[in-house]
């Protein structure tokens, strides 16, 4: 009888150990990935990352969990991208202008009027499946990062808090907020403005307090971030195209199992397709919201737009030694 009791106890203990080990093994397989970005709730970039999180969970059956920290919760895009580069954060998202802090080659998209909305689909194809995308991946790898999504951001437009703007000349003498991108600063100067680099999280206060008179950004982001509360005038300058680059620390990515890497890249592509499909609609809704809130939006005439192109063209020559000619050519080929 005693032998039977001992045998039963051993079987029970074995079952407990097996179940505990199984639970521990399952827990060990779970992967938590933190993703930090500066964008406001409802913005197309934010919506894209929410879709990415959803797809990763679905494709991994809950094994991989993306934790989103938006709206500058963990710091500006520069701060969080530096953390991702160091490996103290798994993923971060930065606007393409701010990526100039990490490699000047990212400034190619900051060149004024290098791309146009009418050729957007060709640009997408080159980034997703062409030589341009391969080159961008190489640039990221050289600074210790792995691209997951070349997120759609959109075309930047100039807006002001006080001074009406309807022409290229109206931009002169404006104190304008810029990113740290040297090209963005140079573009503002070429148009006669006084450029003032300010982090995104501090821009609303700078506009409110009069530190700057205006800024350049997408209508959708400005509306989502409630900058419309202090803005009065806008023009559809569309002077440069920006992306929000979702990057992962490359060493961390390389350490992940191959099937998890595949889940992340597939989810990134699918989320990007979804994000691009809603961006135009969100931008149009934002422009309508501008008007509803009393902001005067001026559509530039072809003549005034030509003045902006002409006045900013010298910026290209100023930075020709910082951006490889091959990279500029790859972008220009998408505009033909």
UniProtKB/Swiss-Prot annotation:
Induction: Highly up-regulated in the presence of isethionate. CDD domains: PBP2_TRAP_Siap_TeaA_like (cd13603). One of its GO terms (biological process) is transmembrane transport. Disruption phenotype: Cells lacking this gene lose the ability to grow with isethionate as the terminal electron acceptor. Belongs to the bacterial solute-binding protein 7 family. InterPro entries: DctP_fam, TRAP_DctP, TRAP_DctP_sf. It comes from the Bacteria. This is Isethionate-binding periplasmic protein DctP. Part of the tripartite ATP-independent periplasmic (TRAP) transport system DctPQM involved in the uptake of isethionate (2-hydroxyethanesulfonate), which is then catabolized by enzymes encoded by adjacent genes in the locus. The DctP subunit is the solute-binding protein. Thereby is involved in an anaerobic respiration pathway that converts the sulfonate isethionate to ammonia, acetate and sulfide. It comes from Oleidesulfovibrio alaskensis (strain ATCC BAA-1058 / DSM 17464 / G20) (Desulfovibrio alaskensis). The keyword Signal applies.
């Amino acid at each position: 009888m005693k032998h039977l009791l001992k045998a039963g106890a051993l079987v029970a203990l074995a079952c407990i150990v097996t179940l505990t080990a199984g639970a521990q093994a399952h827990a060990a397989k779970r992967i938590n990935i933190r993703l930090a970005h500066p964008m406001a709730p409802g913005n197309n970039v934010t919506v894209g990352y929410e879709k990415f999180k959803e797809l990763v969970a679905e494709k991994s059956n809950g094994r991989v969990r993306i934790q989103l920290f938006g709206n500058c919760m963990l710091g500006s895009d520069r701060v969080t991208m530096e953390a991702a580069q160091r490996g103290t954060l798994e993923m971060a998202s930065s606007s393409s202008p701010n990526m100039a802090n990490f490699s000047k080659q990212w400034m190619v998209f900051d060149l004024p009027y290098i791309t146009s909305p009418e050729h957007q689909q060709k640009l997408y194809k080159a980034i997703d499946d062409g030589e341009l995308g391969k080159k961008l991946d190489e640039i990221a790898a050289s600074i210790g990062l792995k691209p997951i999504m070349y997120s759609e951001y959109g075309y930047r437009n100039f807006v002001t808090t006080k001074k009406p703007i309807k022409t290229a000349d109206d931009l002169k003498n404006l104190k304008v907020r810029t990113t740290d991108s040297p090209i963005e600063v140079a573009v503002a100067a070429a148009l006669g403005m006084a450029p003032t680099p300010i982090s995104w999280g501090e821009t609303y206060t700078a506009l409110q307090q009069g530190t700057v008179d205006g800024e350049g950004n997408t209508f959708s982001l400005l509306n989502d971030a409630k900058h419309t509360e202090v803005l009065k005038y806008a023009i559809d300058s569309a002077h440069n195209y920006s992306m929000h680059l979702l990057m992962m620390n490359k060493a961390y990515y390389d350490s992940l199992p191959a099937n998890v890497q595949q889940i992340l890249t597939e989810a990134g592509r699918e989320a990007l397709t979804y994000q691009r499909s809603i961006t135009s609609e969100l931008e149009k809704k934002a422009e309508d919201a501008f008007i509803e809130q009393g902001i005067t939006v001026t559509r530039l005439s072809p003549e005034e737009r030509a003045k902006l192109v002409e006045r900013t063209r010298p910026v290209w020559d100023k930075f020709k030694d910082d951006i490889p000619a091959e990279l500029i050519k790859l972008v220009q080929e998408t505009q033909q």
